[in-house]
Amino acid sequence: MTSKLEQLKQFTTVVADTGDLDAITRLKPVDATTNPSLLLKAAAIPGYADLLEQVKADTKGNVDLACDKFAVSVGAGILKVIPGRISTEVDARLSFDEPALLKKAHQLIELYEAAGIKRDRVLIKLASTWEGIRAAEKLEKEGIQTNLTLLFSFAQAQACADAGVFLISPFVGRIYDWYKKSTGKEYIGAEDPGVQSVTRIYDYYKANGYNTVVMGASFRNIGQIEQLAGCDRLTISPELLVQLSDDQGELPRILKPGNAGEAKQQLNESQFRWAMNEDAMATEKLAEGIRQFARDQEKLEALMADKA
C-alpha cells in the first residue's frame, strides 16, 4: 500500500505551507505558499542568515523594501526546488486599501521579474476583503494571478468566483477552532464545520462552472485533510505532510465534480458586507487573521531594521 500522501497526490495537488526550504526539498510538493507568519519563522532558520544580511545590504535601511525582497528571495529559492508556483502575500495592513494593494502587488511582481522569475510562477496573496477581491479582479485582467486568503465565508467564496480570481484558500482549522471554542464540542470527520465550509464551496464552484481553484488551507489534523481528499489543491504544513507520508492506510476520494451545488448568486458590495456582518465566525476570523499577519509583518520589519 502506498502512503496516504502519495494516494492524495493522485487526485489533489499537494502544496507545502511553509518557507522551510529543507522541508520542501524533502517532501516534494508541487507548489508552496508563504505568509508573513511563515516568513518570520523562516527568518529564524540559520540557513537564511546570509540572505538576511544580503537583503540588509541591498536595501540600505529601506525596511519596507527589505521585507519585500526577503519574501521574494525566499520565494525564488523555493521555486528552484518545486515545479509549480509560489504564493507571496501582500502586507495585510493594506487589506482595506485597493489602490495600495495594487501598488504592492505590482512591486512584488517587479521584484520577481528582476530575479528572472516570470509572473506565471507567482500567485499574489490578498486577504478576502471586498477591497482585496476588487484588487484581485484588476490584477487578473493584467495577467497577474492571485490567491485570495483568509477566506472563512460562503459570501467571500461567491465574490471571489465572480471576480474571476485564479485561486482561493478557504481556511479549515481556524473555522474549526472558532466553533470548538464557541460550542465546547469536538468535531470529527464530515461534522467538522471547516470541512463543511470547503465542501460547500467546492460543490458550488463545480456545479456552476467556475474555474477558480479551491485550495483548502489551515489544517489541525490529517482527518480534516482526509475529508477533503479530491479538492483541487490542499496546502499542508510539513508536520502534517510527514504524518500523511508515514501513514500507509487507505485514502478514498471524497470531493468530486458532479455533486449537487447551490444555484449561482452574484453579490454586490452591500450584499457582501451584510453577509459578512451576519456571519460572526467569518467576521471575527477575518479580522483576527489580518491582525495576526499585520503583527508578524511588523515583527519582520523590526528584524530587518535590527539587521540593518
From Swiss-Prot:
Pathway assigned to this chain's UniProt record: Carbohydrate degradation; pentose phosphate pathway; D-glyceraldehyde 3-phosphate and beta-D-fructose 6-phosphate from D-ribose 5-phosphate and D-xylulose 5-phosphate (non-oxidative stage): step 2/3
Gene Ontology molecular function terms on file: transaldolase activity
SUPFAM superfamilies: Aldolase
A GO cellular component annotation in the UniProt record: cytosol
EC primary class: transferase
Keyword Transport among UniProt keywords: no
Any one GO biological process: carbohydrate metabolic process
Keywords: Cytoplasm, Pentose shunt, Schiff base, Transferase
Quaternary assembly: Homodimer.
Protein purpose: Transaldolase is important for the balance of metabolites in the pentose-phosphate pathway.
Protein name in UniProt: Transaldolase
Gene: tal
